[in-house]
Protein backbone atom coordinates (compact mmCIF):
# COMPACT_ATOMS: atom_id res chain seq x y z
CA UNK A 1 0.00 0.00 0.00
CA UNK A 2 1.04 3.56 -0.68
CA UNK A 3 0.30 6.92 0.90
CA UNK A 4 -1.58 8.86 -1.77
CA UNK A 5 -3.17 12.23 -2.40
CA UNK A 6 -5.81 13.76 -4.66
CA UNK A 7 -5.49 17.48 -3.96
CA UNK A 8 -4.93 19.96 -6.78
CA UNK A 9 -3.22 21.57 -8.58
CA UNK A 10 -0.41 19.40 -9.89
CA UNK A 11 2.20 22.15 -10.07
CA UNK A 12 5.66 22.82 -8.65
CA UNK A 13 4.43 24.54 -5.50
CA UNK A 14 1.98 21.82 -4.58
CA UNK A 15 4.33 18.99 -5.51
CA UNK A 16 6.98 20.45 -3.17
CA UNK A 17 4.39 20.51 -0.41
CA UNK A 18 3.45 16.87 -1.01
CA UNK A 19 7.07 15.74 -1.16
CA UNK A 20 7.74 17.50 2.16
CA UNK A 21 5.29 15.15 3.90
CA UNK A 22 6.41 11.95 2.22
CA UNK A 23 3.67 11.68 -0.41
CA UNK A 24 5.11 9.75 -3.35
CA UNK A 25 1.98 8.64 -5.23
CA UNK A 26 -0.87 10.90 -6.30
CA UNK A 27 -3.93 11.45 -8.43
CA UNK A 28 -2.86 14.07 -10.96
CA UNK A 29 -4.52 17.00 -12.69
CA UNK A 30 -2.85 17.80 -16.02
CA UNK A 31 -3.19 21.18 -17.68
CA UNK A 32 -5.59 20.72 -20.61
CA UNK A 33 -5.59 23.31 -23.36
CA UNK A 34 -8.84 24.37 -24.98
CA UNK A 35 -12.23 22.77 -24.39
CA UNK A 36 -11.13 19.14 -24.56
CA UNK A 37 -12.29 16.77 -21.83
CA UNK A 38 -9.07 14.78 -22.03
CA UNK A 39 -5.35 15.49 -21.86
CA UNK A 40 -3.09 14.63 -24.75
CA UNK A 41 -0.23 12.21 -24.24
CA UNK A 42 2.19 15.15 -24.29
CA UNK A 43 0.17 16.98 -21.62
CA UNK A 44 0.16 13.87 -19.46
CA UNK A 45 3.88 13.34 -19.87
CA UNK A 46 4.64 16.96 -18.98
CA UNK A 47 2.73 16.50 -15.74
CA UNK A 48 4.47 13.20 -15.04
CA UNK A 49 7.91 14.71 -15.69
CA UNK A 50 7.14 17.61 -13.34
CA UNK A 51 6.09 15.18 -10.60
CA UNK A 52 9.11 12.96 -11.17
CA UNK A 53 11.41 15.86 -10.19
CA UNK A 54 10.07 15.35 -6.67
CA UNK A 55 10.09 11.53 -6.87
CA UNK A 56 6.30 11.53 -7.14
CA UNK A 57 4.41 9.08 -9.35
CA UNK A 58 1.08 9.84 -11.04
CA UNK A 59 -0.93 6.71 -10.27
CA UNK A 60 -4.40 7.99 -11.16
CA UNK A 61 -6.25 10.79 -12.95
CA UNK A 62 -9.42 12.71 -12.18
CA UNK A 63 -11.08 13.72 -15.50
CA UNK A 64 -12.86 17.06 -16.00
CA UNK A 65 -16.20 15.25 -16.32
CA UNK A 66 -18.14 12.98 -13.96
CA UNK A 67 -17.05 14.97 -10.93
CA UNK A 68 -18.61 15.00 -7.46
CA UNK A 69 -20.32 18.34 -8.11
CA UNK A 70 -24.07 18.99 -8.07
CA UNK A 71 -25.62 18.53 -11.50
CA UNK A 72 -26.96 22.10 -11.55
CA UNK A 73 -23.35 23.36 -11.39
CA UNK A 74 -21.74 20.70 -13.59
CA UNK A 75 -20.20 22.03 -16.83
CA UNK A 76 -20.62 18.73 -18.67
CA UNK A 77 -23.78 17.05 -17.33
CA UNK A 78 -24.87 15.12 -20.44
CA UNK A 79 -23.86 11.63 -19.27
CA UNK A 80 -25.77 11.91 -16.02
CA UNK A 81 -28.72 13.65 -17.70
CA UNK A 82 -28.90 10.97 -20.42
CA UNK A 83 -28.74 13.67 -23.08
CA UNK A 84 -27.94 12.31 -26.52
CA UNK A 85 -25.98 12.99 -28.67
CA UNK A 86 -24.05 15.08 -26.13
CA UNK A 87 -23.40 12.17 -23.78
CA UNK A 88 -22.03 10.08 -26.63
CA UNK A 89 -19.56 12.84 -27.51
CA UNK A 90 -18.49 13.08 -23.86
CA UNK A 91 -18.09 9.31 -23.61
CA UNK A 92 -15.97 9.33 -26.78
CA UNK A 93 -13.67 11.91 -25.20
CA UNK A 94 -13.32 9.78 -22.08
CA UNK A 95 -12.49 6.80 -24.30
CA UNK A 96 -9.71 8.91 -25.81
CA UNK A 97 -8.50 9.75 -22.31
CA UNK A 98 -8.27 6.04 -21.51
CA UNK A 99 -6.14 5.43 -24.61
CA UNK A 100 -3.88 8.38 -23.80
CA UNK A 101 -3.42 7.22 -20.20
CA UNK A 102 -2.33 3.82 -21.45
CA UNK A 103 0.20 5.39 -23.81
CA UNK A 104 1.54 7.68 -21.08
CA UNK A 105 1.67 4.94 -18.44
CA UNK A 106 -1.03 6.11 -16.02
CA UNK A 107 -2.98 3.03 -14.86
CA UNK A 108 -6.19 4.37 -13.31
CA UNK A 109 -8.98 6.93 -13.79
CA UNK A 110 -11.37 7.75 -10.97
CA UNK A 111 -14.82 9.22 -11.49
CA UNK A 112 -18.27 9.81 -9.99
CA UNK A 113 -21.74 8.96 -11.27
CA UNK A 114 -23.53 11.57 -9.20
CA UNK A 115 -26.38 14.00 -9.70
CA UNK A 116 -26.69 15.51 -6.22
CA UNK A 117 -22.99 15.92 -5.48
CA UNK A 118 -21.86 15.75 -1.84
CA UNK A 119 -24.75 16.47 0.53
CA UNK A 120 -24.15 18.08 3.93
CA UNK A 121 -26.45 20.00 6.29
CA UNK A 122 -23.88 22.13 8.11
CA UNK A 123 -20.81 22.24 10.33
CA UNK A 124 -20.21 21.46 14.00
CA UNK A 125 -17.40 22.36 16.38
CA UNK A 126 -14.52 19.90 16.49
CA UNK A 127 -11.37 19.76 18.56
CA UNK A 128 -9.48 23.02 18.96
CA UNK A 129 -10.85 25.49 16.44
CA UNK A 130 -11.59 22.86 13.80
CA UNK A 131 -15.01 22.64 12.18
CA UNK A 132 -16.45 19.32 10.99
CA UNK A 133 -18.89 18.79 8.14
CA UNK A 134 -22.19 17.17 9.13
CA UNK A 135 -25.05 15.35 7.40
CA UNK A 136 -28.22 14.99 9.44
CA UNK A 137 -31.14 13.78 7.36
CA UNK A 138 -33.64 15.02 9.94
CA UNK A 139 -32.35 18.56 9.33
CA UNK A 140 -32.31 18.33 5.55
CA UNK A 141 -35.13 20.07 3.73
CA UNK A 142 -37.65 17.60 2.27
CA UNK A 143 -39.18 20.29 0.05
CA UNK A 144 -35.88 21.09 -1.67
CA UNK A 145 -36.67 21.66 -5.37
CA UNK A 146 -35.78 19.18 -8.07
CA UNK A 147 -32.49 19.55 -9.91
CA UNK A 148 -32.29 20.07 -13.65
CA UNK A 149 -32.29 16.26 -13.87
CA UNK A 150 -35.90 16.16 -12.65
CA UNK A 151 -37.13 12.91 -11.12
CA UNK A 152 -34.58 10.10 -11.52
CA UNK A 153 -35.86 6.83 -10.09
CA UNK A 154 -33.74 3.73 -9.55
CA UNK A 155 -34.50 2.20 -12.95
CA UNK A 156 -33.57 5.41 -14.77
CA UNK A 157 -30.35 5.76 -12.79
CA UNK A 158 -29.31 2.17 -13.48
CA UNK A 159 -30.01 2.71 -17.19
CA UNK A 160 -27.63 5.68 -17.25
CA UNK A 161 -24.95 3.76 -15.39
CA UNK A 162 -25.27 0.74 -17.67
CA UNK A 163 -25.24 2.88 -20.83
CA UNK A 164 -21.97 4.42 -19.67
CA UNK A 165 -20.31 1.18 -18.60
CA UNK A 166 -21.31 -0.61 -21.82
CA UNK A 167 -19.26 1.94 -23.76
CA UNK A 168 -16.37 2.61 -21.37
CA UNK A 169 -15.40 -0.73 -19.84
CA UNK A 170 -14.61 -2.48 -23.17
CA UNK A 171 -12.10 0.30 -23.92
CA UNK A 172 -10.69 0.05 -20.39
CA UNK A 173 -10.29 -3.70 -20.93
CA UNK A 174 -8.48 -3.19 -24.21
CA UNK A 175 -6.04 -0.66 -22.77
CA UNK A 176 -5.83 -2.13 -19.25
CA UNK A 177 -6.87 1.04 -17.41
CA UNK A 178 -8.66 0.64 -14.07
CA UNK A 179 -11.88 2.67 -13.89
CA UNK A 180 -12.60 3.52 -10.24
CA UNK A 181 -16.09 4.80 -9.42
CA UNK A 182 -16.82 6.71 -6.20
CA UNK A 183 -19.97 5.85 -4.18
CA UNK A 184 -22.67 8.50 -3.88
CA UNK A 185 -22.08 10.64 -0.79
CA UNK A 186 -24.14 10.10 1.29
CA UNK A 187 -26.86 7.56 0.72
CA UNK A 188 -30.44 8.81 1.00
CA UNK A 189 -33.75 7.07 1.79
CA UNK A 190 -35.26 4.79 -0.89
CA UNK A 191 -37.74 7.48 -1.93
CA UNK A 192 -34.77 9.66 -2.90
CA UNK A 193 -33.78 13.25 -2.27
CA UNK A 194 -34.46 16.16 -4.61
CA UNK A 195 -36.22 13.58 -6.75
CA UNK A 196 -33.09 11.42 -7.16
CA UNK A 197 -32.68 7.82 -6.01
CA UNK A 198 -29.00 7.37 -5.14
CA UNK A 199 -28.52 3.77 -6.26
CA UNK A 200 -24.79 3.88 -5.48
CA UNK A 201 -25.50 5.05 -1.94
CA UNK A 202 -26.01 1.56 -0.49
CA UNK A 203 -23.78 -1.48 -0.16
CA UNK A 204 -26.23 -3.55 -2.20
CA UNK A 205 -26.11 -0.93 -4.93
CA UNK A 206 -22.32 -1.08 -5.05
CA UNK A 207 -22.44 -4.88 -5.18
CA UNK A 208 -24.76 -4.67 -8.18
CA UNK A 209 -22.59 -2.01 -9.81
CA UNK A 210 -19.46 -4.17 -9.94
CA UNK A 211 -21.38 -7.00 -11.67
CA UNK A 212 -22.36 -4.80 -14.63
CA UNK A 213 -19.78 -5.35 -17.37
CA UNK A 214 -17.72 -7.57 -15.06
CA UNK A 215 -14.03 -6.87 -15.63
CA UNK A 216 -10.74 -6.62 -13.70
CA UNK A 217 -10.69 -2.99 -14.87
CA UNK A 218 -14.14 -2.11 -13.51
CA UNK A 219 -14.24 -1.33 -9.80
CA UNK A 220 -14.41 1.27 -7.07
CA UNK A 221 -12.74 4.36 -5.79
CA UNK A 222 -13.49 2.90 -2.37
CA UNK A 223 -14.33 5.91 -0.22
CA UNK A 224 -14.23 4.34 3.22
CA UNK A 225 -15.81 7.49 4.64
CA UNK A 226 -18.78 7.41 2.28
CA UNK A 227 -19.27 3.68 2.72
CA UNK A 228 -19.15 4.12 6.50
CA UNK A 229 -21.90 6.72 6.05
CA UNK A 230 -24.04 4.00 4.44
CA UNK A 231 -23.87 1.74 7.51
CA UNK A 232 -25.87 1.63 10.73
CA UNK A 233 -22.79 0.63 12.76
CA UNK A 234 -19.68 1.48 10.74
CA UNK A 235 -17.34 0.69 13.62
CA UNK A 236 -18.21 -3.00 13.33
CA UNK A 237 -19.59 -3.37 9.79
CA UNK A 238 -16.98 -1.65 7.62
CA UNK A 239 -14.42 -4.45 7.86
CA UNK A 240 -16.61 -7.05 6.16
CA UNK A 241 -17.44 -4.53 3.44
CA UNK A 242 -13.71 -4.04 2.80
CA UNK A 243 -13.34 -7.81 2.66
CA UNK A 244 -16.26 -8.22 0.23
CA UNK A 245 -14.90 -5.81 -2.36
CA UNK A 246 -11.23 -6.39 -1.56
CA UNK A 247 -11.30 -10.16 -2.05
CA UNK A 248 -12.99 -9.58 -5.42
CA UNK A 249 -10.19 -7.15 -6.36
CA UNK A 250 -12.66 -4.32 -6.91
CA UNK A 251 -10.89 -1.71 -4.78
CA UNK A 252 -8.72 0.46 -7.06
CA UNK A 253 -8.18 3.43 -4.74
CA UNK A 254 -9.07 4.20 -1.12
CA UNK A 255 -10.29 7.46 0.39
CA UNK A 256 -9.15 6.78 3.95
CA UNK A 257 -11.61 8.97 5.84
CA UNK A 258 -13.29 8.53 9.23
CA UNK A 259 -16.68 9.58 10.60
CA UNK A 260 -18.58 9.62 13.86
CA UNK A 261 -22.16 8.50 13.59
CA UNK A 262 -24.02 6.32 11.13
CA UNK A 263 -26.33 6.36 8.13
CA UNK A 264 -28.38 9.58 7.96
CA UNK A 265 -26.56 11.19 10.92
CA UNK A 266 -22.79 11.66 10.95
CA UNK A 267 -19.91 14.13 11.09
CA UNK A 268 -16.58 13.93 9.24
CA UNK A 269 -13.62 13.88 11.65
CA UNK A 270 -9.86 13.44 11.76
CA UNK A 271 -8.79 9.84 11.07
CA UNK A 272 -7.72 9.16 14.66
CA UNK A 273 -11.00 10.12 16.36
CA UNK A 274 -13.78 8.43 14.41
CA UNK A 275 -15.88 5.34 15.00
CA UNK A 276 -13.77 3.18 12.66
CA UNK A 277 -10.54 1.73 14.05
CA UNK A 278 -8.05 2.68 11.34
CA UNK A 279 -5.39 0.30 12.66
CA UNK A 280 -7.81 -2.59 12.19
CA UNK A 281 -8.98 -1.22 8.85
CA UNK A 282 -5.51 -1.03 7.34
CA UNK A 283 -4.83 -4.59 8.49
CA UNK A 284 -7.95 -5.71 6.61
CA UNK A 285 -6.69 -3.97 3.46
CA UNK A 286 -3.45 -5.88 3.90
CA UNK A 287 -5.40 -9.10 4.50
CA UNK A 288 -7.19 -8.79 1.13
CA UNK A 289 -3.99 -7.91 -0.72
CA UNK A 290 -4.86 -4.31 -1.55
CA UNK A 291 -1.78 -2.77 -3.28
CA UNK A 292 -2.75 0.79 -4.26
CA UNK A 293 -3.09 4.22 -2.62
CA UNK A 294 -4.62 5.17 0.73
CA UNK A 295 -5.35 8.90 0.62
CA UNK A 296 -7.05 11.57 2.72
CA UNK A 297 -10.38 12.79 1.44
CA UNK A 298 -12.45 15.50 3.14
CA UNK A 299 -10.64 17.07 6.09
CA UNK A 300 -11.74 19.35 8.94
CA UNK A 301 -11.67 23.10 8.38
CA UNK A 302 -9.98 25.81 10.45
CA UNK A 303 -9.91 29.57 10.04
CA UNK A 304 -6.12 29.65 10.46
CA UNK A 305 -5.73 26.95 7.79
CA UNK A 306 -7.92 28.21 4.91
CA UNK A 307 -6.49 25.80 2.32
CA UNK A 308 -6.56 22.84 4.77
CA UNK A 309 -2.84 22.25 4.26
CA UNK A 310 -2.34 21.55 7.97
CA UNK A 311 -5.27 19.14 8.10
CA UNK A 312 -3.99 17.24 5.08
CA UNK A 313 -0.45 17.16 6.49
CA UNK A 314 -1.80 15.60 9.69
CA UNK A 315 -3.58 12.95 7.61
CA UNK A 316 -0.48 12.23 5.51
CA UNK A 317 1.58 11.60 8.62
CA UNK A 318 -1.10 9.47 10.23
CA UNK A 319 -1.59 7.27 7.16
CA UNK A 320 2.14 7.01 6.48
CA UNK A 321 2.75 5.84 10.04
CA UNK A 322 0.02 3.20 9.74
CA UNK A 323 1.52 1.88 6.51
CA UNK A 324 4.98 1.75 8.07
CA UNK A 325 3.70 -0.02 11.17
CA UNK A 326 2.04 -2.87 9.30
CA UNK A 327 5.02 -3.15 6.94
CA UNK A 328 7.28 -3.70 9.95
CA UNK A 329 4.86 -6.31 11.33
CA UNK A 330 5.01 -8.33 8.13
Q: What residue spans do the PLM features occupy?
A:
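Histidine-acidic metal/acid-base catalytic patches
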Residues: 2-4, 9, 15-19, 49-52, ...
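Structural motif corresponding to the early beta-alpha repeats
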Residues: 32-162, 166, 173-174
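Surface-exposed cleft-lining segments at the edges of enzyme active sites
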Residues: 145-160, 186-198, 267-268
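Alpha-helix initiation/capping motif
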Residues: 11-14, 40, 136-138, 153, ...
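Short, well-ordered beta-to-alpha junction loops that form the rim of enzyme active sites
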Residues: 111-116, 183-185, 298-299
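Ligand-binding pocket scaffold of soluble enzyme catalytic domains
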Residues: 1-37, 42-45, 49-55, 61-63, ...
